[in-house]
């Protein structure tokens, strides 16, 4: 696409209409401050952009800040590396959702780290199904063990 205006408009429409939550954040000290969120992010979290812009994105973690995935994200951001992980987040109404979060550092034309681009996908259904499968497999293993002990 040769027309830069057309390309910019297409990219804007792509981000605004994406099904996944997309955010842009900038690093300020130990904080990662949201400077843009798309409509899908607002739908996913229940927060409007007016409520959350220029805040650190940790508000989605609620009180549950001891998750291993949070350490993974923080380390990647501190090292300016891309990362993808799943973490537990909370919507504005307090309900839990499992968030597959991808964070990618963005460098400007002089190779300065300027922003982080985050993409959020609600994977609650997948996590719930995996937990149910793991539980069923544990029960099967326990039953197999009990059957083996009865055979002796």
Q: What does each model-found stretch correspond to?
A:
Residues 5-37, 152:
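Sensory modules in modular signal-transduction proteins
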Residues 84-88, 93-102, 107, 117:
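PAS/PAC sensory module
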Residues 2-5, 9, 127-145:
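Sensory-domain boundary/capping and coupling elements
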Residues 63-95, 143, 149:
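Terminal output helix/cap of sensory domains in signal transduction proteins
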Residues 41-52:
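PAS/PAS-like sensory domain cap-loop motif
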Residues 53-64:
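PAS-family sensory/regulatory domains
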Residues 112-123, 132:
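PAS-family sensory domains
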């Amino acid at each position: 696409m040769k027309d830069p205006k057309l390309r910019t408009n297409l990219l804007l429409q792509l981000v605004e209409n994406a099904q996944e939550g997309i955010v842009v954040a900038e690093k300020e000290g130990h904080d990662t401050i949201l400077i843009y969120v798309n409509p899908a992010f607002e739908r996913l979290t229940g927060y409007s952009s007016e409520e959350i812009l220029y805040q650190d994105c940790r508000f989605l973690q609620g009180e549950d800040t001891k998750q291993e995935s949070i350490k993974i994200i923080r380390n990647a951001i501190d090292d300016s590396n891309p990362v993808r992980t799943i973490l537990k987040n909370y919507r504005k109404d307090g309900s839990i959702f499992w968030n597959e979060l991808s964070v990618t550092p963005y460098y400007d034309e002089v190779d300065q780290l300027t922003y982080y681009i985050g993409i959020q996908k609600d994977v609650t259904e997948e996590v719930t199904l995996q937990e149910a499968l793991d539980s069923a497999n544990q029960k099967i293993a326990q039953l197999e063990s009990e059957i083996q002990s009865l055979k002796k």
